[in-house]
């Protein structure tokens, strides 16, 4: 029996998911084609696409938006199990926008039936992840899952965006080296007040979660650093979604270890955006789908 944390298990899972992803994409496309231009489904989907074009890149088209929705539908049950009780999905505007479109899709009986046919598959995956009881184990699984998931289920996205994840030992080396360089060149540490840190391509959040876990941030500086001096950008919608949950979960665990409280603290430094497009628009966006 394959263990949940093994590459073999997630490789097999992502091969199945490639077929399932194709079915979801076909179904979503069919429902949108069948919907009248004035329908609620078409309206909320158009708002969703507009929001992506404004926040990410004007070149985002309906097909890419459909792929993003398929990613959300396929992996959400897995991460719901892995981060049970997490409040991110209740509060994050991007998550709410995605779920709003999904809710309108679920109103269609054929779509709901297609989803029900996968319930046994999702239950088996959820059973495998529910016993992951610490952030390190979850990060390991997330990295392997995403590596295999995008390569097999969404190869065009992986090729287009160059999705490759840095091994954790390399991440740790880079973070420690940055701290040493900062001390030697500027007399500051990553923990010091006024030292802001941005991860322009956050992926699933490994750099920031390891920063919080390695002890490079002093306990007395944790809350300030997390709430005011840490920032992360991500262009892949589902990576953004998972990175935020991952970072918030790790911060909660580290804060609790240091006696800083156990209440949920959202990571407000997380932004869904194209880092290379940041200088192209500075005006405030009023997007109905992402409120």
Model-derived segments and spans:
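Non-catalytic, mostly N-terminal accessory regions of nucleic-acid modification and defense proteins
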Residues: 1-169, 251, 255-265
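SAM-dependent methyltransferase catalytic region
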Residues: 137, 149-291
């Amino acid at each position: 029996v394959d263990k949940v944390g093994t590459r073999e298990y997630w490789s097999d899972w992502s091969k199945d998911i490639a077929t399932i992803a194709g079915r979801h994409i076909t179904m979503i496309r069919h429902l949108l084609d069948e919907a009248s231009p004035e329908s609620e489904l078409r309206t909320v989907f158009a708002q969703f696409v507009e929001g992506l074009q404004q926040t990410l890149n004007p070149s985002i088209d309906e097909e890419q938006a459909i792929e993003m929705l398929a990613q959300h539908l396929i992996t959400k049950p897995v991460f719901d199990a892995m981060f049970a009780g997490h409040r991110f999905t209740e509060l994050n505007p991007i998550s709410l926008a995605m779920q709003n479109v999904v809710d309108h899709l679920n109103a269609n009986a054929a779509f709901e039936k297609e989803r029900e046919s996968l319930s046994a598959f999702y239950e088996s995956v959820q059973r495998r992840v529910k016993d992951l009881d610490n952030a390190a184990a979850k990060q390991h699984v997330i990295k392997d899952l995403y590596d295999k998931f995008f390569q097999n289920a969404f190869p065009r996205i992986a090729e287009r965006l160059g999705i490759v994840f840095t091994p954790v030992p390399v991440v740790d080396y880079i973070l420690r080296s940055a701290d040493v360089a900062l001390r030697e060149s500027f007399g500051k540490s990553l923990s010091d007040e006024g030292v802001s840190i941005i991860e322009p391509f956050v992926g699933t959040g490994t750099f920031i979660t390891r920063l919080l876990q390695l002890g490079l941030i002093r306990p007395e500086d944790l809350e300030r650093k997390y709430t005011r001096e840490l920032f992360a950008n991500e262009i892949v919608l589902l990576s953004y979604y998972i990175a935020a949950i991952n970072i918030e979960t790790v911060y909660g665990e580290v804060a609790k270890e240091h006696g800083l409280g156990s209440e949920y603290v959202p990571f407000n430094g997380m932004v869904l955006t194209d880092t290379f497009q940041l200088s192209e628009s500075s005006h405030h966006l009023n997007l109905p789908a992402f409120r």
